[in-house]
A protein has these predicted regions:
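N-terminal signal-anchor module of multipass membrane proteins
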Residues: 1-122, 126
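Central hydrophobic cores of alpha-helical transmembrane segments in multi-pass inner-membrane proteins
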Residues: 125-139, 176-184
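Membrane-interface helix-loop-helix junctions at boundaries between adjacent transmembrane segments
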Residues: 147-228
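Generic transmembrane alpha-helix motif of multi-pass integral membrane proteins
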Residues: 155-165, 182, 278-283, 334-340
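Long hydrophobic alpha-helical segments that form multi-pass transmembrane helix bundles
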Residues: 191-277
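A beta-strand-loop signature enriched in Asp, Gly, Thr, and Trp
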Residues: 294-350
Length: 411
């Protein structure tokens, strides 16, 4: 089968090469060829390469590493939705999601039913995100006459996982459009962007359409459709409770272990620290993620949280929240593993990665605690650090050069 596919590919390849009838569509042909086959280019001369990893493999590893968070996110959507609809009933639901869910029904509280409900909400968001993103990638590749790389696989799944389950599909299209075009392509494409494309798209949605990205009605699928909030029920996330009641507000409504497992309202892929931890192991073991950034961010968060705990406040209950709660609520774990470690927009020097990570950890706590307008600060903290990454690397390199010059002057 593989040999037959290779022969078919070789027979049509001349049509897409320079001078061929379909030469203008070479980026599309090249993307399909690279997706199906491994590269045919072989190096014959001695080279200075320690690993065979390339952009294609890096992107595929990150994409696959996001699967545990994705599958748990779908389960959690189904679980939260069934719990909510048990209270309000299904008679009040009338959008297209529930028409699809009714193919299976709400009565069965099984694992597969919960996965189906989660898939009904998440898969359309991911499909629209990927389809719109690939259209923009193809357009820029054809116009600029360069290859289509696998970066969209990562940007699309991370963007979709960072969204609430009830996000309108047209907003998903708008968000990924902004992330791909403004966050990446206008700067030259993959490898030249200084902002994380997925986070750029989500930040655009957050400020352009705040009612769909924040509040108490967007984190549980179906709640925004019915608009019914039963007595004693809230769709607020742990961060929402923490902003109002501090540590007491958290412990009155959630256990730390539930937050660690991910059985809480939130964005699709951001709730389960265990699922995200699996991804962290994969990315660290393959060398895709930098342990310096992860540890730097984690330590920065602990230090800043501890300082604020000691300082305290009589008017702001967020000062009471300890570091081990900050770790399991909001998008801290997701942003730490998938967004902060993105190699293009982050620092490239070893010392710079420690500083870059610490900057993220300190900033996310300051935004969460000090700024009442943004109870979740991970997105803004990473984008803020993205802006400083080139400066950090420049300072590290300049300092190393100055050290070498001083050392030479003593010889």
């Amino acid at each position: 089968m593989k040999a037959w596919l290779r022969s078919v590919n070789e027979s049509i390849k001349p049509k897409f090469m320079p001078g061929g009838a379909q030469a203008k569509w070479f980026p599309i042909y090249d993307a399909i060829e690279n997706f199906i086959f491994s590269s045919t280019h072989k190096t014959t001369n001695p080279i200075h390469v320690r690993d065979s990893i390339d952009i294609q493999r890096i992107m595929v590893i990150v994409w696959l590493a996001a699967f545990p968070a994705m599958f748990f996110g779908m389960y959690n959507i189904g679980n939260q939705t069934l719990d909510y609809l048990t209270l309000v009933g299904t008679a009040n639901t009338n959008d297209w999601h529930h028409a699809l869910i009714n193919l299976v029904g709400y009565s069965n509280n099984s694992f597969l039913t919960k996965m189906w409900i989660g898939a009904v909400y998440f898969v359309p968001i991911y499909a629209v995100t990927f389809a719109v993103g690939i259209l923009w990638e193809i357009l820029f590749a054809v116009v600029r006459k360069h290859e289509i790389n696998e970066g969209l696989f990562v940007s699309s799944i991370l963007f979709a996982l960072s969204c609430p389950p009830d996000l309108p599909l047209w907003q998903a299209a708008m968000g990924i459009t902004f992330g791909i075009v403004i966050g990446k392509e206008v700067f030259g494409g993959t490898g030249k962007n200084f902002l994380n494309p997925a986070l750029t798209g989500r930040a655009f949605l957050y400020f352009a359409y705040p009612s769909q990205l924040s509040g108490d009605k967007v984190w549980i699928a179906g709640l925004s459709d019915t608009g019914i909030i039963p007595e004693g029920f809230s769709g607020a996330t742990p961060l929402g409770y923490a902003a109002e009641g501090g540590l007491q507000g958290l412990t009155d409504n959630f256990s730390w272990f539930d937050a660690f497992l991910g059985n809480i309202p939130g964005s699709v892929g951001e709730t389960s620290v265990i699922a995200i931890g699996i991804a962290a192991v994969i990315l660290l073991a393959t060398g895709v993620a930098s342990y310096r950034i992860i540890l730097g961010t984690f330590l920065g968060m602990i230090v800043m949280t501890s300082i604020l705990n000691i300082v305290g406040s009589d008017t702001n209950p967020m000062f009471q929240v300890p570091w081990y709660w900050h770790f399991v609520i909001g998008s801290f774990a997701f942003g730490l593993v998938f967004m902060a470690t993105e190699p293009v927009s982050g620092s490239g020097t070893n010392a710079g990665r420690w500083i870059y990570g610490a900057l993220i950890g300190v900033t996310v706590v300051l935004i969460r605690v000090i700024n009442p307008a943004f109870p979740e600060g991970m997105m803004l903290a990473i984008l803020f650090a993205n802006l400083f990454a080139p400066v950090i690397d420049h300072m590290v390199v300049s300092n190393n050069i100055a050290k070498r010059k001083r050392a030479l002057s003593y010889e």
